Amino acid sequence: STFAQYKGLDVVKVANSQQPYINENIHIPDIEGYKTLKCDFHTHTIFSDGTIMPEERVWEGNRRGLDAIAITEHIEYRPHNSFIKADHNESYKIAKGVEKNANIIVIPGAEITRNKPLGHLNALFLKDANALDIEDPLIAIDNALEQGAFIMWNHPGWPNDTSTIYKVHQELIKQKKIHGIELVNGFEFYPIAFNFCKDYNLTYMGNTDIHGVYNQTYRTDRQYGPMTIVFARERSIEGIKEALFAHRSVVKFGDMLIGSENNLKALMKACLSYKIKPVKGNEAIMEISNKSTLNSV
């Protein structure tokens, strides 16, 4: 018997019983003059209302093939605070600790979490998230801006399935205090928000807003986890920040690509190659190859 064969051994390790390490292996080539970076700018951990630890969220990003991930805990909503005793910067600090080994850029952020009409906004590239923990959300936005933050208006169609741009948003956009809109969040797409981005010259954003375990939430066989594709001068937090403020982004949502005409053209040019084979006379065959793993190309 198998037991008889193992009898007398101290330890028997059965490696085949372990969950295999599977990477989504999403390949998107660099566009001309810029590096193409795959990013998720909206995630949560147990330090707000998520269910996993910050370091595991980073490793999930690694397995997804991301170049960057932002840790954006709710400022006002922390249901685990009876046993998670920490300030608003702690989850980022923990995530940052595995950044090098996971080979992924960890971006500090936070989510200002208020009811509509203001709604939820992510502040990215923060130096101190604690400065946002105040009663007046508009002052919280100003405090984030003083730190050089990029402000993203999150899921405009949630929770009432109506994407309304209220007066407060118009004023913030006019004052250059909102820089991008999350027109894809998780499983939802807000088509009218595409018009907001276009009309107000804002950055197109799409993210998971993941709270649970990624591979228990999204179909990994079809690359359905949304992401923001960023065209940066360099693979660094500074490069990503500059690119977002310069509106160099495209949203990937399942098989859809969403963005400005210029950015989409640049991406298609990088992904597709053409070869013309003469046949006879004036006839020829054009072969088009997809150099990416994007299903929409």
Language-model features, listed with the residues they occupy:
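Conserved catalytic scaffold of divalent metal-dependent phosphoesterases
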Residues: 156-158
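Compositionally biased regions
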Residues: 2-3, 145
